[in-house]
Amino acid sequence: MTRVESNNTASQAPPSGAGTLEQQVEVVIVTGLSGAGRGTAAKVLEDLGWYVADNLPPELIGRMVELGAAADPPIRRLALVMDVRSRFFTGDLSVVADQLRALGLRTRVLFLEASDDVLIRRFGFARRRHPLQSESADGTLSAGIAVERVRLAGVKAAADLVIDTTELSIHQLHRKLEEAYGGGAPAALQLTVQSFGFKYGVPLDADMVLDVRFLPNPHWIPELREHSGQETVVSEYVLSRPGAQDYLHTCHHLVDLTTSGYRQEGKRYMTVAVGCTGGKHRSVAIAEALGELIGADTSAESADVVRVVHRDLGRE
């Protein structure tokens, strides 16, 4: 069921209740070849609700798990990113894994890899040196990659999941990680419907911009001028204008089509900006009405969380 949140996103607290760490926390160790996508994987896991810690010293992991389980809200899903650049990384994750399992935690290891050609291309694009390049025999990028492959061979062999990102787009990697670590359900698609005034500029983060300046402006009606589109007297006026309902439902259909495509591409956030001249009357009324329509939509294409915000309301 779609949830509608107006002006601010409601906080969602995980179920309360005491229990063992095993019941409360699961851990995934994210590692693999440099350039294979660890950073991207960490961002995806964060979007999926995991708390991500980068190169945490092994002696602090157990303490962090305990503190996270006792936090409010508790940290129930912890992703530990570990790579060869860390002075704590030995190439053998058995000590770390044993620590976590001794606490009764479900612990998995994710290993990311890619072909040499792709890794070389990615490093060239980013204009970075490989972290083990200076340790290789001839100091070349390809030699650094070879050293890392040897060093991480045991880690790869012990991993619960190995993902080769050679042919994967970011969105394809997102889907694979969602299948493995999403908890059995797709991550929520969060939609923001934002009203604004064109005279203050179009929102830079807008994925879709709707222009409602074709509707009659309540500003020129003295008894409506001081009211906003959040008030019934203005919203009823705006929504009853010729073409308003057709436009509203057409936009709803367009947003549904777009959110469906966003889901397929692994995207999780979308902002629809609704603009009028000053961001007080027409855009506010249409944004509220569009948010209600999307919020009442139970189809598979609809967003899961809808937030309605008014950027320029009160700015005049």
Curated annotation (Swiss-Prot):
**Record's Gene3D superfamilies?**
P-loop containing nucleotide triphosphate hydrolases (3.40.50.300)
Q: Which residues bind ATP?
A: G32, L33, S34, G35, A36, G37, R38, G39
Q: Name one Pfam family in it.
A: RapZ-like_N
For the keyword Nucleotide-binding, the answer is yes
Is Cell membrane found in the keyword set? no
**Residue sites binding GTP per the record:** D83, V84, R85, S86
Q: Name one GO molecular function term.
A: ATP binding
Query: What UniProt keywords are attached to this protein's entry?
Result: ATP-binding, GTP-binding, Nucleotide-binding
UniProt family annotation:
Belongs to the RapZ-like family.
- Role played: Displays ATPase and GTPase activities.
Q: Which HAMAP family match?
A: RapZ_like
What is the protein name stated in its UniProt record? Answer: Nucleotide-binding protein NFA_35930
Q: Which organism is it from?
A: Nocardia farcinica (strain IFM 10152)
